[in-house]
Amino acid sequence: MIRGLRQIEPYVAGVQPAERKMIKLNTNENAYGASPKVREALANFDVDNLRKYSTLEQADLRAALANNLKVKPEQLMIANGSDDVLSIAFLAFFNNDEPVLFPDLTYGFYKVWADLYRVNYHEIPLAEDFTINTEDYLADNGGIILTNPNAPTGIYKPLNEIEKLLKANQDTVVIIDEAYISFGGQSALSLLNKYNNLVITRTFSKDAALAGLRVGYAIANEPLIAVMNAVKHSINPYSVDLLAERLATAAVEDWSYYQENAKKIQKTRAWFSEQLVKQGFDVLPSQANFVLTKPHDLATAKLFEELEARKIYVRYFPKVERIKDYLRISMGTQEEMEEVVKAIEEIRG
């Protein structure tokens, strides 16, 4: 027997079907695609540049983001998707004896990273209505990480409650994962200059429709960004490739396009939620680009299988006790969601 092998339960990602004709609503991707400037940047990209290593600091992308977000470039760190950003953050900030706190029902990678990096952690149960109770996060801890709006619930925690957490935990890092913030709620960005312990993470996968590129970033004050960069450069200083940086920069420069698409998604989410309620479903109040919903007059497993048979792919969590009777359904285009509603009506008979 070979000694020294790591035993770990990995993160389980959503299925990536190969069909050409389908409605894919299982991984919270953006149905509206890349902006005109991104398409132009791709068409004009000089392939000969790929013989060179990528830049170390992603200066162009950081400058574009800094201008967009009204922060300094030194307050930004770019990495290979927000998963990479968050993985770096776990290594950079969670080195205390006290446990890192996060909800029992949230982004599944948090527990995986904590186990992988041997970080002490405590999963705090969400309330019965799936909300996060601020008081649960005021005890001694080694750091806090919250997705806001949360996933897979889609529920948003108000900014005044986020500030309470920051104020009560000023000697540890509080990470707010804002992967879905463009679809509802208020960003914690306004708190950045007030709290040195705040780290905000974001991704280009959701609002910018660039999930296939793998680009994400952290926003924090310079001392924390410096620690993250030190960790990043100790693992892979070239983690963001040239093409990804160029296309992400073009996306930031064309941000009004994505803002309009986010409005479409919000409108479709409201309409779709209303249709589900009319059919007797429970629907959690989402501020993300998905809804978590529970049918009442048929088994969730049957609905999942019947939708899949129609090449409509949604997310089902049969092994997660608290949401085993729920489906998470990403928002497609309005036309796609109308097809989903028709399919559900057919399945219900």
UniProtKB/Swiss-Prot annotation:
SUPFAM superfamilies: PLP-dependent transferases. It comes from the Bacteria. GO terms for molecular function: histidinol-phosphate transaminase activity; pyridoxal phosphate binding. Keywords: Amino-acid biosynthesis, Aminotransferase, Histidine biosynthesis, Pyridoxal phosphate, Transferase. Pathway: Amino-acid biosynthesis; L-histidine biosynthesis; L-histidine from 5-phospho-alpha-D-ribose 1-diphosphate: step 7/9. GO terms for biological process: L-histidine biosynthetic process. InterPro entries: Aminotransferase_I/II_large, HisP_aminotrans, HistidinolP_aminotransfase, PyrdxlP-dep_Trfase, PyrdxlP-dep_Trfase_major, PyrdxlP-dep_Trfase_small. The modification N6-(pyridoxal phosphate)lysine is found at K206. Belongs to the class-II pyridoxal-phosphate-dependent aminotransferase family. Histidinol-phosphate aminotransferase subfamily. This is Histidinol-phosphate aminotransferase. It comes from Streptococcus mutans serotype c (strain ATCC 700610 / UA159). The gene is hisC.
